[in-house]
């Protein structure tokens, strides 16, 4: 069994953190008992179509009879399936000032046996010191210290921005729950709960006033969201979205719509033209590269004017050397390796061919 005492200043997000744990328990199919006014259809992980949400709303300031009426939270020995009991504003009815209240001890005794009944407990209170000392020593297994990021200030940077702009540096509204093992602020940190919480604001009554009048806040079990909202909800199929689209189009200014469509058409035209220009430019660049390569290859194939320098034959092997005007020697075997075809008619008549290039070579040059 886990018992958490959630503490924090006013507006620090204590109830929000507890409601997030309630949502987690309901999503797993567990049982929840609480003195909070919940709006089950606004839980994102539950939704308005859930048919089996087991929630019990007990009195604002519960007595032993209220706690006994919720029964067992888990019938198995698997503690991960325990139910969750959430009690808010414990500082008004579970505080150290009312230590002489005769109904206090039976409630503490029940909480001590909550593990055997299959319940995890979350007490919500402004400060752990406000809690009854006997209950604090016996039950405060984990203490959660809640903080809000948007109420903090970044050192140096926040001060500079405040001086320059006249306002605080806006930080995101993120809620932190630092879980300590024990009621000492220096105890070991065992977990950290982080929530933005914006999707849970509508899931509970943030302005709920707790009273001891049982006629105003009697115990009851709320119906599952399907029977209060889901069964009356409009089915969100394709027809629904088409109808909503038509309604929004009618509500919007026709001149604005026409301007939007004209702007969209102009943007599409500019994009099409830019793509066509880009493709044309790429085509021109490719053609220029091809022409340069072909000219380079063609110039590389042209040989200077040659004349036969020597001719030798041994059996079927014929070797011919050529020379140009600068007396540079070219061997027939080297020309063949470079891709030229050497046709030898006789010792004074040789033809060199490569693609469209042809040169007739004789002994006179």
UniProtKB/Swiss-Prot annotation:
<keyword id="KW-1249">Viral extrusion</keyword>
<dbReference type="GO" id="GO:0005524">
    <property type="term" value="F:ATP binding"/>
</dbReference>
<comment type="subunit">
    <text>Interacts with G4P; this interaction results in a complex that spans the inner an outer host membranes.</text>
</comment>
<dbReference type="InterPro" id="IPR008900">
    <property type="entry name" value="Zot_N"/>
</dbReference>
<dbReference type="GO" id="GO:0033644">
    <property type="term" value="C:host cell membrane"/>
</dbReference>
<keyword id="KW-0472">Membrane</keyword>
<dbReference type="GO" id="GO:0016020">
    <property type="term" value="C:membrane"/>
</dbReference>
<keyword id="KW-1133">Transmembrane helix</keyword>
<dbReference type="Pfam" id="PF05707">
    <property type="entry name" value="Zot"/>
</dbReference>
<comment type="similarity">
    <text>Belongs to the inovirus G1P protein family.</text>
</comment>
<keyword id="KW-0812">Transmembrane</keyword>
<keyword id="KW-0067">ATP-binding</keyword>
<dbReference type="GO" id="GO:0099045">
    <property type="term" value="P:viral extrusion"/>
</dbReference>
<comment type="function">
    <text>Isoform G1P plays an essential role in phage assembly. It is required to increase the number of adhesion zones between the inner and outer membranes of the host cell. The extrusion of neo-synthesized phages occurs at these adhesion sites. May be involved with G4P in creating zone through which the phage assembled and extruded.</text>
</comment>
<comment type="function">
    <text>Isoform G11P is also involved in phage assembly, probably playing a structural role in the formation of the phage assembly site.</text>
</comment>
<keyword id="KW-0547">Nucleotide-binding</keyword>
<dbReference type="InterPro" id="IPR027417">
    <property type="entry name" value="P-loop_NTPase"/>
</dbReference>
<keyword id="KW-1043">Host membrane</keyword>
<protein>
    <recommendedName>
        <fullName>Gene 1 protein</fullName>
    </recommendedName>
</protein>
<feature type="binding site">
    <location>
        <begin position="8"/>
        <end position="15"/>
    </location>
    <ligand>
        <name>ATP</name>
    </ligand>
</feature>
<feature type="transmembrane region" description="Helical">
    <location>
        <begin position="255"/>
        <end position="272"/>
    </location>
</feature>
<keyword id="KW-1188">Viral release from host cell</keyword>
